[in-house]
């Protein structure tokens, strides 16, 4: 509005000035001689008009400045006081809510969370370890499952058979050792060396088997691959694979020496530091009628050894001593374990060689069995334990040599033999294993 007033006043003054100029020109025409007077008058009037215009301009500019200042003041004052009130209320409410939650959060929730973490941390560590072991076991099982579990038999080169017609024989799981009910046992023949046949897997089930199912139908192959998913793949010679793992009705024969192997004896006349602590046995020799007292000492772990092996083998005593001396000692040994010796062989059953001594011929053991039961005279299931190599010189491949024992209380030879004898009871021919003590000679083929 002030600007409009300024422009209107300015226009009005200019119009007035034009009218004055027109009148002055008319007066000059009318009043020629008085030209100077009129000029003075016009100049005077012009100056007055200019001064008025300047005053009006200054007044309008000052008025505009005042209006601008008033407008700025109005803008500085908030238009909506209600919005400010709502903002203040929200801030106050948030502050009050934070104050209300401060004590419960830092005094109840935070301590409970820290206690929960402390109690559950060991459980979480155990859980992670279990998961890690499970993953590792799964990976190992997967790698084992990728291995082909099959068995191959090599027949004579003259036979020509079709691999598709090969019969697959399976062996059920063993109750002991590392054959479990969850293992798959696969035994497969392969007529061509190096060829791969598709193995037939039979899941082992814990059920009762007949003798015909437990025994292998064919044992003519020279070597066989036998294994389980957990055991892997192993190459065994033919005669090391048992005819039936569970068929333990027919026990092998374990022939044991007496003196220096199971016991040590000393006559009463000899001076020995421990002679008075041994078991006293009176021996009467029939021919001369002389009675002699002997102090008998058992080898360490003798009773435990006889108790264990009596469950696995038929025990036989074979000694180079006289019958009159051996029988009282054997009777005393039999009173120390639940079983007994099935046979007793003495010096009269040995073979005497000049310059060598008494030799124990194991064929007498098989001959007595053959006469009683009509079985073969092979020594594939006979083991002899002796401390003298001369005693088993005729059957070296059937022998297990132990150190001769006299009085060492820390001796553990009998105890160390138990795991080996437990495994040997499953072998088809004990000579294939015991002959390995000869080294490379055991692999020489005539």
Curated annotation (Swiss-Prot):
One GO CC annotation: Nem1-Spo7 phosphatase complex
Stretches for region Disordered: 53-80, 132-168
TM helices/strands, residue ranges: 87-103
Domain FCP1 homology: 247-424
GO biological process: lipid droplet formation; negative regulation of phospholipid biosynthetic process; nuclear envelope organization; positive regulation of lipid biosynthetic process; regulation of phospholipid biosynthetic process
Enzyme Commission number, as recorded: 3.1.3.16
Annotated Pfam families: NIF
InterPro entries named in the record: Dullard_phosphatase, FCP1_dom, HAD-like_sf, HAD_sf, TIM50
Keywords on record: Endoplasmic reticulum, Hydrolase, Membrane, Nucleus, Protein phosphatase, Transmembrane, Transmembrane helix
Topology with respect to the bilayer: Single-pass membrane protein
Regions of compositional bias (Polar residues) in chain numbering: 139-156
Subcellular locations according to the entry: Endoplasmic reticulum membrane; Nucleus membrane
The keyword Transport is assigned to this record: no
Primary site of residence: endoplasmic reticulum
Subunit structure: Component of the NEM1-SPO7 complex.
Family affiliation: Belongs to the Dullard family.
Role summary: Catalytic component of the NEM1-SPO7 complex which acts as a phosphatase and dephosphorylates the phosphatidic acid phosphohydrolase PAH1. Essential for the formation of a spherical nucleus and meiotic division. The NEM1-SPOo7 protein phosphatase is required for efficient mitophagy under prolonged respiration, as well as for reticulophagy and pexophagy.
Name the UniProt record assigns to this protein: Nuclear envelope morphology protein 1
Lineage: Eukaryota, Fungi, Dikarya, Ascomycota, Saccharomycotina
Gene: NEM1
């Amino acid at each position: 509005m002030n600007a409009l007033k300024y422009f209107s006043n300015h226009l009005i003054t200019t119009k007035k000035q034009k009218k004055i100029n027109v009148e002055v020109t008319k007066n000059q025409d009318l009043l020629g001689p008085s030209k100077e007077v009129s000029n003075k008058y016009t100049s005077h009037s012009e100056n007055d008009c200019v001064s008025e215009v300047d005053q009006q301009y200054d007044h309008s500019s000052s008025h505009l400045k005042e209006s601008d200042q008033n407008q700025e003041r109005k803008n500085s004052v908030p238009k909506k006081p209600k919005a400010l009130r709502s903002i203040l209320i929200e801030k106050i409410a948030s502050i009050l809510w934070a104050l209300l939650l401060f004590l419960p959060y830092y005094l109840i929730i935070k301590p409970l969370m820290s206690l929960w973490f402390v109690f559950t941390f060991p459980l979480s560590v155990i859980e992670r370890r279990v998961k890690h072991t499970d993953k590792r076991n799964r990976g190992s099982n997967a790698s084992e499952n990728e291995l082909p579990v099959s068995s191959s038999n090599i027949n004579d080169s003259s036979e020509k058979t079709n691999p598709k017609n090969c019969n697959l024989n399976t062996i059920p799981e063993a109750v002991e050792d590392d054959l479990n009910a969850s293992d798959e046992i696969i035994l497969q023949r392969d007529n061509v060396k190096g060829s791969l046949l598709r193995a037939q897997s039979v899941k082992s089930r814990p059920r009762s088997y007949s003798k015909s199912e437990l025994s292998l139908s064919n044992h003519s192959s020279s070597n066989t691959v036998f294994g389980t998913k957990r055991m892997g793949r192993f190459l065994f010679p033919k005669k090391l694979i048992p005819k039936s793992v569970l068929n333990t009705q027919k026990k092998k024969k374990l022939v044991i020496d007496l003196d220096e192997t199971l016991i040590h004896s000393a006559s009463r006349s000899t001076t020995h530091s421990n002679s008075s602590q041994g078991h006293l046995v009176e021996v009467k020799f029939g021919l001369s009628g002389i009675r002699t007292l002997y102090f008998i000492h058992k080898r360490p772990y003798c009773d435990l050894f006889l108790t264990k092996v009596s469950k696995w083998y038929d025990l036989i005593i074979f000694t180079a001593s006289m019958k009159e001396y051996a029988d009282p000692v054997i009777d005393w040994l039999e009173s120390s374990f639940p079983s007994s010796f099935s046979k007793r062989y003495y010096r009269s059953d040995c073979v005497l060689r000049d310059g060598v001594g008494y030799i124990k011929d194991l064929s007498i053991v098989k001959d007595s069995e053959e006469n009683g039961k009509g079985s073969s005279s092979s020594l594939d299931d006979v083991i002899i334990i002796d401390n003298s190599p001369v005693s088993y010189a005729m059957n070296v491949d059937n022998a297990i040599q132990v150190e001769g024992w006299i009085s060492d209380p820390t001796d553990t030879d009998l105890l160390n033999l138990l795991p080996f004898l437990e495994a040997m009871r499953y072998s088809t021919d004990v000579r294939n294993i015991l002959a390995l003590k000869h080294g490379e000679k055991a692999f020489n083929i005539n």
